[in-house]
Amino acid sequence: GTDKDPRTCENYMDLWVAEMDKNGNWKAPVLIDGEGINTEDNEGTVAFDGRGKTMFFTRCPNVKKQNLGCEIWVSESKGKNKWGTPKKLELKPHDSLTVGHPCVSEDGRFLIFASDLPGGFGGLDLWATTYERKSDSWTTPVNLGPEINTSGNDAFPTFAKNGDLFYATDGKPGIGGLDIFRAAKQGEENKWSNPVNMGSPINSLNNDYALVEHTDRTGYFTSERKSQNGENKPDIYKYEIPPYVFDLKVIVTDLNEKNVKIADAKVVVTDNNGGTWEG
């Protein structure tokens, strides 16, 4: 949009697309191509299904420059970077001012979102709903529970490659403002627990949120930390987890005769994520 958002004193947000060239450099962003996607309202916080064919995004309407909460809208792909007219996601019951920050499963049938729906633990909570093909509707939202949600704001959920859940919260002990946490997936069920703060340098003294994995060791997130020009406005940052480097000396002995070393024994080391090293 062209008007100024009174909360941020910045222009209302639109959705943009940037492509990476063959050298790994980002091209200049362009407005997303789709009738009715970008409006005079705020549009942001996008999620796609695994095929990239369905797009969920947040829209925060304003009438006479008065913000009226947020909604989730859905659009279907019409070809490369082209999108169809979006439809509002209908949730039942929907007794909430704010519904946004969609996070969708690979098959597009399981959705986590942030909302101030009644029955939460305070502020924004994370809720889940499942698409039922037979009725062509979404089930009544279920709160993710007190292990994930807090009395503060819990928002910006995304899925890790292994099914873990990233999200931002200001309701748990952290470094400052919204911090990014990672909660472990529990078996095959849609449950997560044991959220762990991602720590520095991903989290800062300011708000950090919306982490998206690219690979299991690289990704992107938004941060309001002080930039090179001295401003604390939201910017996108890239992170990379360095490879594990360690020296390990192992001596293998006979179980019955401990002083007898076994030559050329095969040793396998396994980490908590299932990675293995052989030597």
Question: Each PLM stretch: what is its role?
Answer:
Residues G1-I251, L255-K261, K266-V268, G275-E278:
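Short, conserved micro-motifs composed of acidic
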